[in-house]
UniProtKB/Swiss-Prot annotation:
It comes from the Bacteria. Pfam families: DUF188 (PF02639). This is UPF0178 protein YaiI. PANTHER family: UPF0178 PROTEIN YAII. Belongs to the UPF0178 family.
Length: 154
């Protein structure tokens, strides 16, 4: 079981939460990016550098993730592919993607892409708030408790 991070777009405050969680959970954490990353020394944390290019990091995460893994990403198509493989997916704001919600999210993403392509300014997401950080940490903890229950450790 591994936590995979779409690290190029992941906010540093979320990475910090993940570093601490990897140590506490003693769970492998892999940050996938197309640039060098500095991470704290740990036997649980590693980086995987991929070539620059559209969706290269996403494709590598999809290739390597397995059922039971966790993928941290704001990229909806990546989350959809991870869910298809049986992994869980959480975005940096603490929202868990599920098979029930991912189709709706993909449809909304495609709609927003169409608006942008037609010249309509849609704006980006708000900056990450303290509430978002707390929601992320809470959802990560919830996922970890589910893992422990499934292993019979609770």
């Amino acid at each position: 079981m591994t936590i995979w991070v779409d690290a190029d777009a992941c906010p540093n405050v979320i990475k910090e939460i993940l570093y601490r969680a990897a140590e506490r959970m003693q769970m492998p954490l892999v940050l996938v990016a197309n640039q060098s990353l500095r991470v704290p020394p740990s036997r649980f944390i590693r980086t995987l550098r991929v070539a620059a290019g559209f969706d290269v990091a996403d494709n590598e995460i999809v290739r390597q993730c397995e059922a039971g893994d966790l993928v941290i990403t704001a990229d909806i198509p990546l989350a959809a592919e991870a869910i298809e493989k049986g992994a869980a997916a959480i975005n940096p704001r603490g929202e868990r993607y599920t098979p029930a919600t991912i189709r709706e999210r993909l449809t909304m993403r495609d709609f927003m892409d169409t608006l942008r392509a037609s010249g309509i300014q849609t704006g980006g997401p708000d900056s990450l708030s303290q509430r978002d950080r707390q929601a992320f940490a809470a959802e990560l903890e919830k996922w970890w408790l589910e893992v422990q229950r499934s292993r019979g450790q609770m």
